Structure formats: C-alpha cells, structure tokens
Amino acid sequence: MAITYNNLYLDIRQRLRAAGIESATLEARELVCFGTNKSREELARDGGLYASPELEHRVRDLVRRHLEGEPVAYLIGEWEFYGLPLDISRDVLIPRPETAELVELIVEESPNARRLLDIGTGSGCIAISLDKKLPDAKVEAWDISEEALAIARKNNDALEARVRFLQRDVLADDWEKIPSFDVIVSNPPYVTETEKNEMDANVLEWEPGLALFVPDEDPLRFYNRIARLGSELLLPGGKLYFEINQAYGRETAHILEMNQYRDARVIKDIFGKDRIVTANR
C-alpha cells in the first residue's frame, strides 16, 4: 500500500522511539530526507504526496541498518554542527552538542581573538565554526590523521571557510614553537580503555578509536602535553579551552594550574556533567 511522505516519517519516528532512541524525531527526519533525496523544506512541502515503493524501501533499509547499530551520520554522510552542514565519514568522530557548547563559550569569551588553534580537529567542526563566527580571526587546525584532514578540508571548501589545516602529531616535539595564538582549543582523545565497557556499541564499532581512546595508565596524556605546548604557543593573556572526560575535571584543571595558567575553571555541559576546562595564560 502506498504511503505519504509524512506518514512514512511518522512511522519511522515511531519505530525509533520504540527502540528507545531519544533523538527519534531528528533521526527520522534525516533518514527520510536522505532516503527520498529531499531537503527538509521539500519534505514538509510534499508531506501529503505519496512516496514511490522504491523510495520507501530505501528509507526502510536505512532504518534497518540504523537499528542494527550504524549511526545516522555515517549512513547519510553528513551531520549538522553549530548550524553548519558537515560531511562526515568513519574517519572522524560525529560532532556532538557538548562540543558546540565549547565553541559557543569561546565565541562569548574571546570575541576579539585574532589567531586561534584547534588541536585534533577531526571533521573541522570546531575550527570551521570559529572561522565563521569570528570573521576577523585566523584559525589554524591540526590533526595526525590524513583521512580526517581530507574531510576537514572538504568541509572548509564547501562552507567557504578559511581555516589552515596542518598534519601534526601533538605528542611529537619536532617543530619550531613561536608564541602566536590568542586561543588554543582541543577536544582530544579522553576515553580510557576501561571505559570502553560503558560505551554504546554503535560508538565502539563505528567511530575511530584513534580519536577516542587513551591508555588507563596515562588518561590525561594529551592534556598534559597541550598544557605545556600552550605555554609556548599562547600569547600573554591567551586562553586555553579543553573538552574533557567528565571523570577528570578537577585533575585537568590542576594540570593547568601546575603549568602556571590562571583562573582555571571546570564548566558543566547541558547534561550537568563536567565537560569543559578553561584557563588564562
């Protein structure tokens, strides 16, 4: 029996809700739009029209794959972050709302920053968002992964941003360091190996481990390194911003204090969890 686009969307939303998916409304819309080759506006406009059996089958196959664990962002190859449409692949993490809070904080606190550095850029979501919100600033972004940088540069071009992307291993120490940044931001790997057991299977099986995990015996390795690096790269009065593992808020702030940063703060995210640490140089 033929089904309208709107009823197809409602049916998919109900299936996702029944599966316990909190963001069922958003995910149903994205899957139906992608599966039927319609924009959100076109889906709303054509809601009363009938979908062809081929399109309905395509949408339901996408839903099946999602219910088996494949994230929507990887199914459709894109995800929205801070109002920007980003290409996404399994080479990068799926941008999350907590990270958008980090961008918003930087924009609010450092609107006059002229040079910003994003370490571990992944899809480029932080760097590109900052570039778009702070048009007078110059943004640089680093990642160790060639594949991630390819995605980031693609997003940079598509969104007509001006971020300078470099392949760089932040744990290495093989380049000249000149104080030149007003802001350094990083959302580095921070999930311990032990915490794997607490993670959703769709994250473990699909998202890149290189961007997620750190060894149990050295869970703050990136924060220690970037704090020291920031002391060399930040201009006087510059600011350092971290997204963190909620279990290590106080410890991360202590690292900054031990590296002579001032006014270290631990900030909770929209879910009430310690998620951001920031301090002044």
Describe the residue ranges of each PLM region.
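A short acidic, helix-capping loop that chelates divalent metal ions and anchors anionic groups
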Residues: 42-43, 85, 211-214
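N-terminal auxiliary segments of SAM/dcSAM-dependent transferases
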Residues: 2-76
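S-adenosylmethionine
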Residues: 133-281
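Residues at secondary-structure transition points
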Residues: 3, 26, 50, 54, ...
